[in-house]
């Protein structure tokens, strides 16, 4: 997919809003005209709602609106210059915190604490070494941890036009069959109706509106420059298979940390696809199915897309650790039962034993522990770097966010299997034997931190029949800046949806989130107990017992629910 071509570590949207001058140009806000629910097939919606950005959004934009120089740190991870993340000890007074900042970097400014954060952001000279400044803060007695704002990205496999082609839908949802979901739905027909799943990602196509935007000149994530297109009215529609007639109430506490609004619209398609796997409407006679099709969905946008950049909401594509941490904490504080993180970043392999080294993500680990402490089950994609050789970390680098799960009971990291695992049961295992093939997806990162496996798909053995399919935007109308998709650059359309095939551990993680929602619906609400059940009752793939490719095995929805004594 374009969204992760090259799997660059690209950071979070920091808002540029009304009235700000950036690089000598006045940025324009995103205005939503005619906002409404439910989905597009429910008829026209009166043009009556305008939502310009708030003064708080503009204030934050002023903090972050500088050019976004990217640095590759000594620890190997890319980070954004000009700021550091600092967690002061609770006992430290405000005066002591300000004194610590002055001591470490005379020109540093501790910014006002933002919502959903227990840490501070200190702005520094963009020319300063952010990792060196963070190390100096870590040496202070008032500080719990400090780090550079390392970059993260969606865990989707690199670009191939075929990944997103959808003129027909011949393969069926082999991925749901693999999890024994038909039997699981018989056991738990409510399929998570009392459970809220937060998808911390690129947003969600959950409303009908018109985007009133000015498209400026921008550089996409591959480094290609595109000219300004000026003022545009762009149609936007809800994914009818996620928010259909009578289902608007399933969207709970949406929030956008890119634009700092409560309307986290997806301009990429990744977050919508992931949300569909978790909870796409089922038993409605059309389209595809989701795992826990009655769940409530909480879209939390923390990753910017190319169009977020073009619309003036972010100077870059992707996200940073501090924004992911805020998204996790927001979800935990606003009623999420399960948090899905289909995102990641390669980094050091030993953050568990050496958490203060450059390249680790203590701010995200703190947020995950906070969420689990509030009885949220956290699911993290294991990463897509099995065949990647990182210049600092070598072949198959560790996904530092997924690695956190291995030391937090109640959080799990999820590797991907491909369609070859379909039908594997009991003693039959995926091995190197050609009659019992290795069904680990070729791209799926592996290591001691992998705990579970789920369908992520693959194009190598099955072509398009090996993808994971859900409803999301038709890329033909959204990726208008990509000459491999459309020959002429122009404004996008977000009102045309299709059944689209993706592959990646981004796709594997939401299968586990959906099964966990069904377990919670059944009464297992302790995150550590959910993890234990999923691991104990999974289908053992590979060598007997836990291994670095499959973890404890393939999630088996029927076996997990039957483990509660419900025999169907």
Where are these regions (language model features)?
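A cross-family glycoside hydrolase active-site/sugar-binding cleft signature
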Residues: 149, 301, 340-344, 381-382, ...
């Amino acid at each position: 997919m374009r969204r992760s071509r090259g799997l660059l570590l690209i950071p979070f949207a920091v808002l540029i809003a009304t009235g700000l001058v950036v690089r000598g140009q006045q940025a324009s806000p995103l205005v939503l005209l005619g906002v409404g629910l439910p989905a597009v097939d429910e008829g026209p919606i009166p043009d009556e709602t305008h939502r310009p950005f708030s003064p708080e959004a503009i204030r934050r934009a002023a903090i972050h609106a500088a050019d976004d120089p990217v640095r590759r740190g000594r620890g190997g991870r890319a980070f954004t210059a000009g700021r550091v993340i600092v967690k002061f000890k609770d006992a430290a007074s405000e005066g002591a915190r300000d004194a610590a900042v002055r001591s470490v970097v005379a020109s540093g400014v501790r910014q006002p604490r933002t919502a959903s954060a227990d840490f501070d952001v200190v702005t520094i000279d963009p020319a300063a070494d952010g990792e060196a400044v963070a190390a100096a803060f870590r040496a202070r007695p008032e500080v719990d941890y400090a780090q550079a704002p390392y970059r993260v990205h969606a865990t989707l496999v690199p670009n191939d036009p075929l990944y997103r082609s959808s003129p027909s839908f011949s393969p069926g949802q082999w991925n749901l069959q693999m999890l024994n979901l038909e039997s699981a739905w018989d056991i738990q027909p409510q399929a998570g109706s009392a459970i809220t799943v937060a998808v911390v990602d690129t947003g969600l196509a959950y409303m009908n509106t018109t985007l009133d935007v000015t498209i400026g000149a921008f550089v996409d994530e591959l480094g290609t420059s595109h000219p300004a297109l000026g003022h545009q009215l762009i149609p936007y529609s809800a994914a009818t298979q996620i928010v259909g007639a009578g289902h608007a109430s399933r969207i709970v506490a949406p929030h956008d940390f890119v634009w700092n609004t409560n309307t986290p619209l997806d301009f990429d398609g990744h977050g919508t696809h992931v949300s569909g796997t978790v909870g796409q409407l089922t038993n409605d006679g059309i389209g595809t199915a989701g795992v826990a099709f009655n769940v409530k969905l909480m879209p939390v946008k923390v990753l910017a897309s190319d169009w977020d950049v073009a619309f003036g909401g972010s100077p870059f594509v992707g996200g940073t650790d501090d924004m992911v941490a805020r998204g996790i904490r927001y979800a935990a504080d606003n009623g999420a039962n399960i948090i899905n993180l289909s995102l990641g970043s390669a980094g050091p392999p030993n953050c568990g034993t050496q958490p203060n080294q450059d390249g680790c993500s203590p701010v995200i680990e703190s947020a995950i522990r906070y969420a689990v402490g509030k009885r949220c089950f956290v699911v993290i994609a294991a990463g897509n770097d099995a065949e990647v050789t990182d210049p600092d970390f070598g072949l198959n680098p560790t996904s530092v966010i997924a690695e956190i799960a291995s030391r937090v009971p109640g959080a799990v990291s999820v590797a991907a299997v491909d369609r070859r695992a379909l039908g594997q049961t009991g003693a039959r295992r995926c091995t190197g034997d050609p009659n019992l093939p290795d069904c680990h997806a070729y791209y799926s990162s592996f290591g001691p931190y992998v705990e579970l496996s789920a369908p992520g798909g693959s194009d190598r053995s099955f072509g398009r029949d090996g993808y994971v399919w859900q409803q999301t935007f038709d890329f033909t109308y959204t990726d208008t800046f990509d000459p491999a998709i459309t020959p002429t650059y122009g404004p996008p359309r977000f009102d045309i949806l299709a059944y689209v095939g993706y592959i990646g551990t981004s796709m594997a993680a939401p299968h586990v989130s959906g099964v966990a929602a069904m377990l919670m619906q059944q009464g297992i609400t302790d995150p550590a107990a959910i993890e234990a059940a999923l691991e104990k009752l999974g289908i053992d793939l590979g060598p007997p017992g836990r291994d670095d490719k499959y973890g404890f095995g393939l999630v088996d929805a029927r076996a997990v629910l039957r483990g509660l004594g419900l025999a169907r």
